[in-house]
């Protein structure tokens, strides 16, 4: 993705066997940082940037706004955690590449 762009990350939660997990009533947190030892540069949570769009299908969306990525460039680590019935699970990890763009917002 490019700095200053908005993006929606669509995630389907699956168990170890690949079956879809019902996430009804769950809360979610998503964060991005340079590494697991660095300060978080983007943070989203249920109701504030994260929406569960299909609870029985295990689907949630993380919405990144222009301002979230405007001043970022490079490789970032990101992960999402789901809390349900008192248990917390990491349901997504990965890399996020943010490139500079020639056209900048005024």
Language-model regions, residue ranges each:
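Contiguous segments within soluble domain cores/interaction surfaces
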Residues: 1-106
